[in-house]
Amino acid sequence: MLAERIKSLRQKSGMSQAELARKLNVTRSSVNAWELGISTPTTQYVVEFANLFHVSSDYILGIESDMKLDISKFNEEEINLIYDLVKYFDKNKMK
């Protein structure tokens, strides 16, 4: 589960393995090993993934199945924009 979540979040963010490796200050082969499930990232890196991708560490670890957006790092304007987008998509989904 962890390996799939790391790969999925990286791909959804449009990052290559090399880009993620640079952001985490690790090698690309480390990222590749994590995504293949050959090795497991330390707790420190799980927390860094959560912060980088704005999700909970529980989601990354597979404890939660729903991806929840951590909005604590967004400012009020960004939160309002996210709220407006959710309302828009919810309204249009009903049609």
What are these regions (language model features)?
Residues 1-63:
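Helix-turn-helix-like N-terminal two-helix hairpins of bacterial/phage DNA-binding regulators
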